């Protein structure tokens, strides 16, 4: 599907130079004083991980990859593969662990429903939910009278990830973590 260069957004997957590329940063729209407007894109190759910077005229058309999405339930990890179960047919599939960002892998908890995006029947990317609930395993003790302030303290979560949390939280509490930037959202209800 063709897409106008100025309609490209961060996270779009494009077919460019016979490869699949993900737009890894927000496109930079520039209108110089002289000449036509252009869009600067930072793209990452989905297979090799290499980054390139390309400049396109705002009137150029690029090929946006058509991906199929299907929901699966994460079961467990086996060597360099993840075992997922199709929620409709209950078939199990193996996908490479590399289709998920390494900083988000600890947040892939058993029985989590994930979306697998495929291109020509090949898994390209595994999309986690926007937020997950995780328990704080270790953090410095509560500060008496602490309120919501700008100061945060480090905490280690039950999945081994490190995150900054407000000072009023203590070990054993469950929190909601936003996976986009791996940040604290709120106490779990």
Swiss-Prot record:
Protein's pathway? Protein biosynthesis; polypeptide chain elongation
> Which superkingdom heads the taxonomic lineage of this protein's source?
Bacteria
Q: Which PROSITE patterns match?
A: EFP
Assign the protein's first listed, main location to one coarse class.
cytoplasm
Q: Which GO terms describe its molecular function?
A: translation elongation factor activity
SUPFAM superfamilies tied to this protein? Nucleic acid-binding proteins, Translation proteins SH3-like domain
Keywords assigned by UniProt, alphabetized: Cytoplasm, Elongation factor, Protein biosynthesis
| Pfam families documented for this protein | EFP, EFP_N, Elong-fact-P_C
**Key word Transmembrane helix present:** no
SMART domains, alphabetically?
EFP, Elong-fact-P_C
GO biological process per UniProt: peptide biosynthetic process
Q: Key word Cytoplasm present in the record?
A: yes
GO cellular component terms, alphabetically, are: cytoplasm
The cellular location(s) given in this protein's UniProt record come to:
Cytoplasm
Q: What does this protein do?
A: Involved in peptide bond synthesis. Stimulates efficient translation and peptide-bond synthesis on native or reconstituted 70S ribosomes in vitro. Probably functions indirectly by altering the affinity of the ribosome for aminoacyl-tRNA, thus increasing their reactivity as acceptors for peptidyl transferase.
Give the family per the record. Belongs to the elongation factor P family.
Q: State the name under which the record lists this protein.
A: Elongation factor P
Species this chain originates from: Orientia tsutsugamushi (strain Boryong)
Query: What lineage is this protein's organism placed in?
Result: Bacteria, Pseudomonadati, Pseudomonadota, Alphaproteobacteria, Rickettsiales
Gene name tied to this protein: efp
């Amino acid at each position: 599907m063709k897409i106008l260069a100025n309609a490209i957004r961060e996270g779009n997957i494009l077919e460019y130079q016979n490869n699949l590329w993900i737009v890894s940063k927000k496109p930079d729209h520039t209108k110089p004083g002289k000449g036509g407007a252009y869009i600067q894109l930072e793209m990452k190759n989905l297979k090799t991980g290499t980054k390139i910077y390309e400049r396109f005229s705002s009137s150029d058309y690029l090929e946006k990859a058509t991906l199929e999405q299907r929901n699966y339930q994460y079961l467990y990890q086996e060597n360099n593969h993840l075992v997922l179960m199709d929620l409709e047919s209950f078939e199990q599939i193996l996908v490479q662990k590399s289709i998920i960002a390494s900083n988000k892998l600890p947040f892939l908890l058993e029985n989590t429903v994930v979306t697998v995006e495929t291109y020509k029947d090949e898994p390209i990317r595994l999309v986690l939910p926007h937020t997950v609930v995780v328990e704080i395993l270790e953090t410095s003790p509560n500060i008496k009278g602490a309120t919501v302030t700008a100061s945060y303290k480090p905490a280690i979560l039950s999945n081994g990830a490190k995150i900054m949390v407000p000072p009023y939280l203590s070990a054993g509490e469950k929190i909601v973590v936003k996976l986009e930037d791996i940040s604290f959202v709120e106490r779990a209800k």
